[in-house]
Amino acid sequence: MLSKYVGRQTSSIENDITKTRNHSRQRGNIMRVVFGIDVSKVSSEVAILVNGEKVHNYTMSNDAIGFSRLLGDLKTVHKPEIIFEATGVYSRRLQSFLDEHGYAYTRLNPLEAKKQLDSLRVRKTDQIDAEKLAQSQFVLNRKTTYVQEEIYQNLRDLSRFYQNLTEDIVRAKNRLHKALQVTFPELENILSTPSGEQYWNLVIAFPCKDFVLDLSKDELSESIRQSTSKRISDKRVAYLAEKLIALANQSYCAVKKTSPMLEEVRYYAKELFRLSEQRQTILDEMVELAQPLPEYDILLSIPGIAETTATSIIGELGDIRRF
């Protein structure tokens, strides 16, 4: 049980809050309790303010033990106000924990938090910490953050994954291009575009001209047929075979057939094949998730917006009903 780690601290905080509550009642004030949380990579700073007065602050770990302590503190008050600055993946766990336990919260992006605190004349050199976040809530009275359905978060995660894979593909293409300049640069002219399943399979089969010239015409034709999963006519095969031989005769390879550069060329071609397949899988998942959403068909009806763009827009904007 995690309660054994938090009992003493929670009891102390509860006593402090009770004292402040009694003082507030004596003055006829309504008690407001604000939890300001400054989230870092490993831990978070928590500041608890009652009617603008700090009653407690501590550091908690960003794990089950730390969150259990926070939960114990939250349970000691009625309708606590929780405010924290979004710090990317680091604040994601805190947000998930609060969602799971049904607590409303206000999540600020870093620029928004800085702008708001600047307007309150907090010195720009001051670090935006938990206490400042909590203190500003008594002045700004921010609304709680709209909690989207899980499907929108999943779409955002898939959209970011798709973007990362696209960046990986661009890097791998650049590396393949550089390696081919040493072994067989003419091969980039075999198809209309040096990209796609057939091109990468041809690169794997023929990383330098020797692999072309060592084959008979029939063997070369068969390799070309195997380079694509699509149907390819005999005329097209013959054309590519003749062109491949011409490019090989034109080429001068800067390395020997046993050079590790050929292994590098094949590696990047295989990696591009794998990355492209994975990216298509992610896109299919995005489309499957987005199709039931009403905004999906609306976005597709706009000229120039296809499936990839539509799903990415939904992933980045989220549920537009929150605006």
Which residues fall in each region the model found?
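A detector of single, family-specific signature residues
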Residues: 1-323
